[in-house]
Regions:
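Extreme N-terminal starter segment of soluble prokaryotic enzymes
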Residues: 1-3
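Residue-level preference for alpha-helix termini and adjacent loops
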Residues: 25, 30, 64, 78-79, ...
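Short amphipathic alpha-helical segments
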Residues: 71-77, 160, 191-193
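Active-site/acyl-donor-binding loops of N-acyltransferases
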Residues: 7-10, 33-34, 122-169, 288-289, ...
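Low-complexity, flexible helical/coil segments
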Residues: 5, 38-41, 93-98, 109-116, ...
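A conserved beta-strand-loop-helix scaffold within acyl/acetyltransferase catalytic domains
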Residues: 5-51, 55-68, 117, 143-155, ...
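Juxtamembrane/interface motifs at transmembrane-helix termini
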Residues: 76, 225-228, 355, 418
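Acyl-donor binding region in acyl/amide transferases
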Residues: 68-154, 275, 327-391
Length: 434
């Protein structure tokens, strides 16, 4: 086998990717461009068999160690190849090892998009379910060592995710949701939640939502510079969009006014009936209905005053939720999401994600929606897990992270030094938050 550099032949690279079941946006040259605007460099490679046919695709990122001419090579969610063919896999990685050694790489890290064990979306492993242990054995036999298992967000990429197959039988994707979730989406629309695509000029709006979400959920948010870079590289190629949900208070006011008018009409009707009734039980029942309507009428009047105030403050509507979704072929990844704290029960996030699904289904032929990461740690991540679970997706566990040593000395040096550097970085970030 031999390596073929594909930076100037991207159509051929993508043509091979399209034939592979474990293809992913993170192994595209376009994703590599996003990362090379920072501290990484990039290679786009095909591994060719002796008959000159491609058997593997590898978009490899390189990160230089400080002070020395040595690099960590990383194939995000890659490489893309057949992991069931053990002998071919050994040859693929043997060829890559020779190539990477010449590039002064001391090790190769992979975390392929391969499903390992079967789970329910309630975070329970299915007894007797499928177990693609063959993948793991073949990777180890090809010269890799396995990194410690992490079922949270501490890996380079999330090991657990939730994926929803998208279906529309003519009535819309929302109609495939259960009754409770359909109700939430429909109420959001009635309450004035409007969804739309943003542009690069809207990046500061997303950044504000992002800061709110990061502070609330205690994580380090992606910077506006990184998100802008991602958008600038991928949007012209049709691979990312920025989406928003806002509250149109004109719609909300009309909804609240309609509820008040309906309640007032019912109140007037019942009070008129009360004068003609003789049956004590019937009178008592109508009086209870009237009292209940009085409470609702007062509530609706108060709500109308609140909405009028919101309308005066936000005449163009208030943005309450945003999301970045990347796409490749027939798959979408819900990469980043942000929202205000407490949207008054509007379910704007639910409405936004549902609208994104339908838009991508109709416009791009997307048939699989990856929520991109959940955690087994329900105590700290129950909120985000619960939101994603509510769509009734499949919980997917990927095979994990593996490292192939190329230079044993530098490989061991890196894995001794790197955890200490990450720990120091996290301490600095915590201090900055305080």
């Amino acid at each position: 086998m031999y390596i073929k550099e594909m930076s100037n032949a991207l159509e051929e690279y993508h043509a091979f990717m399209e034939t592979q079941a474990n293809r992913t946006v993170f192994q595209t040259p376009e994703w590599g461009e996003v990362k090379t605007d920072g501290s990484w460099t990039r290679d786009v490679l095909l591994v060719m068999a002796d008959n000159h046919e491609p058997v593997a695709a590898a978009m490899i990122l390189y990160r230089k160690l400080p002070g020395v001419n040595k690099y960590l090579a990383y194939a995000p969610r890659g490489i893309v190849t057949d992991y069931t063919n053990a002998e071919q896999l050994k040859s693929v990685f043997a060829a890559l090892k020779v190539y990477l050694k010449a590039k002064n790489a001391f090790g190769l890290k992979i975390d392929p998009e391969l499903q390992w064990r079967e789970w329910t979306n309630k975070f329970e492993m299915v007894e007797g379910g499928f177990n693609n242990e063959e993948y793991r054995k073949n990777i180890l036999a090809a010269g890799f060592v396995e990194r410690p298992m992490d079922l949270g967000f501490d890996g380079i990429q999330p090991r657990l995710t939730m994926i929803l197959p998208l279906k529309d039988e003519g009535k819309g994707i929302v109609e495939t949701f259960n009754k409770k979730e359909r109700y939430k989406v429909n109420v959001a629309k009635k309450q004035g939640v409007v969804c739309y695509k943003g542009t690069l000029e809207d990046m500061p709006i997303y950044d504000e939502l992002n800061k709110i979400t990061a502070e609330r959920d205690q994580y380090v948010a992606r910077s506006i510079e990184y998100l802008t870079t991602m958008y600038q590289h991928l949007h012209p190629k049709g691979m990312v969009d920025l989406y928003f949900a806002k509250v149109d208070y004109n719609v909300q006011l009309a909804f609240a006014t309609n509820r008040l008018e309906t309640a007032q009409k019912e109140y007037d009707k019942l009070t008129g009936q009360l004068e003609t009734l003789n049956n004590p039980k019937r009178i008592e029942n109508v009086q209870k209905q009237i009292e209940s309507l009085k409470v609702n009428i007062a509530k609706y009047e108060k709500e109308i005053e609140r909405v009028k105030g919101d309308l005066e403050q936000y005449p163009e509507g208030k943005v309450v939720s945003g999301a970045f979704v990347v796409t490749y072929l027939d798959k979408a990844y819900y990469l980043y999401g942000a929202n205000i704290t407490g949207d008054g029960g509007l379910n704007a996030n639910k409405a936004l994600v549902s609208w994104i699904m339908q838009t991508l289904y109709d416009e791009k032929g997307i048939r699989s929606f990856d929520f991109f990461g959940v955690s087994e740690d329900q105590e700290h991540h129950g909120g985000i897990n619960g939101f994603k679970q509510s769509f009734d997706p499949e919980l997917v566990e990927y095979i994990g992270e593996f490292d192939m040593p190329i230079s044993k000395f530098w490989f061991e040096m890196f894995h001794t030094w790197a955890p200490k550097a990450v720990s120091l970085k996290n301490k600095i970030l915590v201090r900055r938050k305080k």
